[in-house]
Regions:
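Glycine-rich phosphate-binding active-site loops on the catalytic face of alpha/beta enzymes
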Residues: 36-44, 82-95, 131-164
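Catalytic cores of alpha/beta
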Residues: 15-30, 65-79, 113-116, 120-122, ...
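Alpha-helix-loop-beta-strand connector modules within alpha/beta enzyme cores
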Residues: 1-17, 36-39, 43-66, 94-121, ...
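Glycine-rich loop at the start of a catalytic domain that most often binds anionic cofactors/ligands
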Residues: 1-5, 26-31
Length: 168
């Protein structure tokens, strides 16, 4: 029921469930984001093929911390990559090694050299002042939670992020 309500109010948005493909498919989400310890992208696609109607759009994102993680995800048919963490964050418990700006530059360059055109979103400890340098690495976008949740005015902070991202 919650999935149906969300879909009624988010017809122009991607409704993504974190970590659980089965729940994402059952509640009518358009996407699932899989962490490194969740089921594989290929297993999620097998589930999706059984439950989606022909022509129905569904996205499967994968978490990555290295170029090799991206190679693996691309090989399994990932729709996009959540690459991180950018810096330390308390939002995630089992944190992979922090990449920093140089890590993003290196990995994005490796993706270009490999001919990958998969969307890459930076994640992990991102603040408003990080948007410009991160976007300049060639990533597609950012995923933010803590900076907005902990802001004095989360709505205004969201608008600030949107305005900054829209410059790219």
């Amino acid at each position: 029921e919650i999935g149906q309500l969300i879909n009624e109010h988010t017809n122009k948005c991607i409704y993504c469930i974190n970590d659980n493909a089965r729940i994402a498919l059952r509640c009518g989400a358009n996407a699932v984001h899989l962490g490194k310890e969740d089921i594989s992208v290929s297993a999620a696609w097998e589930m999706a093929k059984e439950q989606l109607f022909p022509g129905e759009t569904f996205y499967i994102g994968a978490t990555a911390n290295t170029f090799e993680d991206i190679e693996h995800a691309v090989g399994q048919g990932a729709s996009y990559i959540g690459l991180g963490p950018f810096r330390y964050t308390e939002t995630k418990k089992k944190l992979s090694p922090v990449l920093g700006l140089e890590g993003y530059r290196k990995i994005v360059q490796q993706c270009k050299e490999a001919g990958y055109k998969i969307p890459i979103f930076a994640i992990g400890g991102i603040c408003l002042e990080d948007v410009t340098p991160l976007m300049e690495t060639g990533i597609t976008g950012i995923a933010v939670s803590g900076a907005i949740i902990h802001a004095e005015d989360p709505v205004e902070e969201t608008h600030r992020f949107i305005n900054e991202i829209n410059k790219y």
